[in-house]
């Protein structure tokens, strides 16, 4: 869980920008999108092997 405390003399826009940066670095949004729908184990394995193949030939 990302937590951002608004500092003294810091605008809300700056705090929001800092919060968005921490959330994107932690990968929370990607994790939520990945878990949004159920994925069969066979599909997970297929995606994992395709990603490994892409990394290998890149």
Swiss-Prot record:
GO terms for molecular function: structural constituent of ribosome. Belongs to the bacterial ribosomal protein bS21 family. GO terms for biological process: translation. The gene is rpsU. InterPro entries: Ribosomal_bS21, Ribosomal_bS21_CS, Ribosomal_bS21_sf. GO terms for cellular component: ribonucleoprotein complex; ribosome. The keyword Ribonucleoprotein applies. This is Small ribosomal subunit protein bS21. The keyword Ribosomal protein applies. It comes from Staphylococcus saprophyticus subsp. saprophyticus (strain ATCC 15305 / DSM 20229 / NCIMB 8711 / NCTC 7292 / S-41). Keywords: Ribonucleoprotein, Ribosomal protein.
